[in-house]
UniProtKB/Swiss-Prot annotation:
F-type ATPases have 2 components, F(1) - the catalytic core - and F(0) - the membrane proton channel. F(1) has five subunits: alpha(3), beta(3), gamma(1), delta(1), epsilon(1). F(0) has three main subunits: a(1), b(2) and c(10-14). The alpha and beta chains form an alternating ring which encloses part of the gamma chain. F(1) is attached to F(0) by a central stalk formed by the gamma and epsilon chains, while a peripheral stalk is formed by the delta and b chains. This is ATP synthase subunit b. It is a single-pass membrane protein. It comes from the Bacteria. GO terms for molecular function: proton-transporting ATP synthase activity, rotational mechanism; proton-transporting ATPase activity, rotational mechanism. The chain crosses the membrane at residues 49-67. It is found in: Cell inner membrane. Keywords: ATP synthesis, Cell inner membrane, Cell membrane, CF(0), Hydrogen ion transport, Ion transport, Membrane, Transmembrane, Transmembrane helix, Transport. GO terms for cellular component: plasma membrane; proton-transporting ATP synthase complex. Its main location: membrane. InterPro entries: ATP_synth_b/b'su_bac/chlpt, ATP_synthase_B_chain. F(1)F(0) ATP synthase produces ATP from ADP in the presence of a proton or sodium gradient. F-type ATPases consist of two structural domains, F(1) containing the extramembraneous catalytic core and F(0) containing the membrane proton channel, linked together by a central stalk and a peripheral stalk. During catalysis, ATP synthesis in the catalytic domain of F(1) is coupled via a rotary mechanism of the central stalk subunits to proton translocation. Belongs to the ATPase B chain family.
């Protein structure tokens, strides 16, 4: 607490003296300013001459550099512009030629479409004719194969019929032989067979 009171007392003392010192400084400054203004006015007159001299030297140097480099710069610039214009004209002619080619193609497009349609119809007819010929050939092959199968089936049926007829004939002959065969005839046959084996 004591410290705070001491600090406040010092601060009040300093502020009380500050206006007095500020007043002294402002009087001294005003006197210096008046002297400086007079001296500055004398120096300013001589400085204006040097400023103009520096300006004239700078303007002359810039004028010399511009005069020396401006001619070639503008010549190169105009040559570049001329070249760009020539390129533009060439591109314009190329674009016009392409546009004329497109117009010509568009004009011929109807004829091209009609030609393509005619060619497509001819190709379709040729394909249909080829398909008809192929179908006729396939039908002929199928008929020939069917005829061969029918002939083969007929031959097999005839063979089966002959075999069946032979089997029937054998059965009939067997029945006839059995009907004629008596036990005495059978014994005589067996004994004759046994004798032949010896």
């Amino acid at each position: 607490m004591r410290r705070l009171a001491v600090y406040l007392a010092i601060a009040v003392g300093l502020f009380a003296q500050a206006p007095k010192e500020g007043a002294r400084e402002s009087l001294a400054e005003k006197a210096d300013e008046a002297g400086n203004k007079a001296h500055a006015a004398e120096e300013e007159g001589s400085m204006d001459i040097w400023k103009w001299a520096n300006f004239l030297i700078l303007a002359g140097g810039l004028g010399y550099l511009v005069g020396k480099n401006a001619g070639p710069f503008f010549a190169a610039r105009s040559a570049g512009i001329r070249k760009d214009m020539e390129n533009s004209l060439a591109q314009q002619k190329d674009a016009e030629a392409r546009a004329a080619d497109v117009d010509r193609r568009l004009a011929n497009m109807e004829a091209d479409i009609a030609a393509l349609r005619g060619e497509g119809e001819r190709a379709a007819r040729a394909e249909a004719e080829r398909m008809e010929q192929h179908t006729a050939a396939e039908i002929a092959k199928i008929q020939q194969h069917s005829e061969q199968e029918i002939a083969s089936a007929g031959k097999a049926a005839r063979m089966d019929l002959k075999r069946y007829a032979a089997e029937l004939a054998v059965e009939l002959a067997e029945q006839k032989v059995r009907a004629r065969m008596t036990p005495e005839t059978q014994d005589a046959l067996v004994q004759g067979f046994v004798r032949n084996l010896k």
